[in-house]
């Protein structure tokens, strides 16, 4: 009986330690203040070699930043060279706000990116838009850094 109690105590300690270690925080690569726009690379993937797949937005905004416009120019260049490739722009928001508000904001963000691609000669017929609002966060923490990573538009190759 004492042996089982010792094993149970050790198991509880081990599980508690494991759970606490899973709660470590991420480094603030891009600032991450409430109104900041995340520009770090830890959540960025690539549409093609050297062409980032996502752009980030300020809180409650669908306006493109200088960094976002630069990324979208590179995407447009890649798309001009790959004329058979179609893309989907996924609009996202952070967890704050209602589901409906965030779906609308995600759509505005994706459409801002689409409009910018179109100014660089990409046909709107090649670009689809979908909004996930706050439904698909890349970082589920409730922190300014997580929110800034989730305020994004992601460009993916259409299937």
How would you name each of these model-derived features?
Residues 2-11:
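Bacterial N-terminal signal peptides that target proteins for export
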Residues 18-22:
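C-terminal motif of bacterial Sec signal peptides marking the signal peptidase cleavage site
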Residues 24-86:
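Periplasmic peptidoglycan-binding/tethering modules of Gram-negative envelope proteins
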Residues 67-74, 100, 108, 112, ...:
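Extracytoplasmic/secreted proteins, especially bacterial periplasmic and envelope-associated proteins
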Residues 84-92, 107-138, 151-159:
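A non-catalytic structural micro-motif
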Residues 93-98:
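Surface-exposed aromatic
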Residues 140-143:
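Short beta-alpha junctions and helix-cap segments that line functional grooves
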Residues 145-149:
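A generic structural micro-feature
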